[in-house]
Swiss-Prot record:
<dbReference type="InterPro" id="IPR014756">
    <property type="entry name" value="Ig_E-set"/>
</dbReference>
<dbReference type="GO" id="GO:0034702">
    <property type="term" value="C:monoatomic ion channel complex"/>
</dbReference>
<protein>
    <recommendedName>
        <fullName>Inward rectifier potassium channel 13</fullName>
    </recommendedName>
</protein>
<feature type="site" description="Role in the control of polyamine-mediated channel gating and in the blocking by intracellular magnesium">
    <location>
        <position position="149"/>
    </location>
</feature>
<keyword id="KW-1003">Cell membrane</keyword>
<keyword id="KW-0851">Voltage-gated channel</keyword>
<feature type="intramembrane region" description="Helical; Pore-forming">
    <location>
        <begin position="106"/>
        <end position="122"/>
    </location>
</feature>
<keyword id="KW-0472">Membrane</keyword>
<keyword id="KW-0630">Potassium</keyword>
<dbReference type="GO" id="GO:0034765">
    <property type="term" value="P:regulation of monoatomic ion transmembrane transport"/>
</dbReference>
<feature type="transmembrane region" description="Helical; Name=M2">
    <location>
        <begin position="132"/>
        <end position="157"/>
    </location>
</feature>
<keyword id="KW-0597">Phosphoprotein</keyword>
<comment type="function">
    <text>Inward rectifier potassium channels are characterized by a greater tendency to allow potassium to flow into the cell rather than out of it. Their voltage dependence is regulated by the concentration of extracellular potassium; as external potassium is raised, the voltage range of the channel opening shifts to more positive voltages. The inward rectification is mainly due to the blockage of outward current by internal magnesium.</text>
</comment>
<keyword id="KW-0813">Transport</keyword>
<feature type="topological domain" description="Extracellular">
    <location>
        <begin position="123"/>
        <end position="131"/>
    </location>
</feature>
<dbReference type="InterPro" id="IPR016449">
    <property type="entry name" value="K_chnl_inward-rec_Kir"/>
</dbReference>
<keyword id="KW-0812">Transmembrane</keyword>
């Protein structure tokens, strides 16, 4: 339970630094001088999936319009080569076979191309079964049109169903804190699953980025653990999780967090989890700068009890911190011991064990 002399605050970030990874996980790294056009063309599928929706809609529309225009030109050329443009289609010569009825202009050819691709049914314009060229061109347009529709439809489905969208419901705390746990300093952050559907096989890793004097970027791995779970992954992610990094003499952060104004660095945190319904892996990223690490603070309690005894998560306390105060020395009876019940780092209730039993 929270101490009564701890005032809950919500720190506001007042200083901005250049960062490699934004708070929502996007990279700010820019590459100059590298060939882009050919690389993107070779991976057309991946490029289309990574595009923003407005560009996908533009590509979608432009692809179909271009397809209609190309085959409108081909239908017009066929009518020109067959001599159909200048004829009276209501009374053609007896020895002449019209390939497509009533194609007498490019507008009519475009309309026929549109009707063919969308299979809305022919009206006055229709291909003749006695013209092999028209039948061949009709088959080619239908085949390429089906391939284009399959590609565009697949891209839409893949873009909607990609695991990246599920990762948006994973939220990191805006700040990290340095607090004592079991008498040892720890770097702590929290992560929450906003949706009710659980995630499984949760793994967290972190990389510390520092710029050296020679201009090179140095990367160091930083290990985080979740309470007393010995395995590297959390099997079930439904309520907020609290991750700890013990700041020992061997920690890469020990020299950076010894004073109030540490040198500039960036700690990038990666969380990977499996979606229970699809089995796909999603990843969420964030980063912490020195100005976003609160020394001598701890997170406010998130878990509470409802009226029926069920657990509730107070998300309004997710980013709130509590100043860490020294634990007061209280003399206790030699036959009485305090127990603090905690779930994933969140203090829920306090009990005392005495010779006569449990007292709350």
């Amino acid at each position: 339970m929270e101490s009564s002399n701890c005032k809950v605050i919500t720190p506001l970030l007042s200083q901005r630094h250049r960062r490699m990874v934004t708070k929502d996980g996007h990279s700010t790294l820019q590459t100059d001088g590298a060939p882009r056009g050919l690389v993107y063309l070779r991976d057309a599928w991946g490029t289309l999936i990574d595009m923003r929706w407005r560009w996908v809609m533009l590509v979608f529309s432009a692809s179909f319009v271009l397809h209609w225009l190309v085959f409108a030109v081909l239908w017009y050329v066929l009518a020109e080569m067959n001599g159909d443009l200048e004829l009276d289609h209501d009374a053609p010569p007896e020895n002449h076979t019209i390939c497509v009825k009533y194609i007498t202009s490019f507008t009519a050819a475009f309309s026929f191309s549109l009707e063919t691709q969308l299979t809305i049914g022919y009206g006055t314009m229709f291909p003749s079964g006695d013209c092999p060229s028209a039948i061949a061109l009709l088959a080619i347009q239908m085949l390429l049109g089906l391939m284009l529709e399959a590609f565009i439809t697949g891209a839409f489905v893949a873009k909607i169903a990609r695991p990246k969208n599920r990762a948006f419901s994973i939220r990191f705390t805006d700040l990290a804190v340095v607090a004592h746990r079991d008498g040892k300093p720890n770097l702590i952050f929290q992560v929450a699953n906003i949706r009710h559907s659980p995630l499984t096989s949760v793994r967290v890793s972190a990389v510390l980025y520092q710029e050296r004097e020679n201009g090179q970027l140095h990367q160091t791995s930083v290990d985080f653990h979740l309470d007393g779970i010995s395995s590297e992954e959390c099997p079930f992610f439904i309520f907020p999780l609290t991750y700890y990094h013990s700041i020992t003499p061997s920690s890469p952060l020990v020299t950076l967090l010894q004073h109030e104004n540490p040198p500039h660095f960036e700690l990038v945190v990666f969380l990977s989890a499996m979606q229970e319904g699809t089995g796909e892996i999603c990843q969420r990223r964030t980063s912490y700068l020195p100005s976003e690490i609160m020394l001598h603070h701890c997170f406010a309690s998130l878990l509470t009890r409802g009226s029926k005894g069920e657990y509730k998560v107070k998300m309004e306390n997710f980013d709130k911190t509590v100043p860490e105060l020294p634990t007061p020395l209280v003399s206790k009876s030699p036959h009485r011991t305090d127990l603090d019940i905690r779930i994933n780092g969140q203090s829920i209730d306090n009990f005392q064990i005495s010779e006569t039993g449990l007292t709350e």
